[in-house]
C-alpha cells in the first residue's frame, strides 16, 4: 500500500526488485 513513486502505465515497475507491484497504474509496496 505504500507508493513507490513509479507508474506502470507503459512499462512495468522497475521497483519490483524491492517488492513493489503494479496497482491502478501505479507501483505500490504493501
Swiss-Prot record:
Tell me, what is an example of a GO biological process annotation in this record?
defense response
* The keyword rRNA processing belongs to this UniProt entry's keyword annotation: no
| Alphabetized PROSITE patterns for the sequence | CYCLOTIDE, CYCLOTIDE_BRACELET
Q: Where in the cell is it found?
A: Secreted
Note what the entry says on domains: The presence of a 'disulfide through disulfide knot' structurally defines this protein as a knottin.
Q: What does this protein do?
A: Probably participates in a plant defense mechanism.
What is the protein named? Cyclotide cter-Q
Amino acid at each position: 500500500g505504500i507508493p513507490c513513486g513509479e507508474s506502470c502505465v507503459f512499462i512495468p515497475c522497475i521497483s519490483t526488485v524491492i517488492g513493489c507491484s503494479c496497482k491502478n497504474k501505479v507501483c505500490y509496496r504493501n
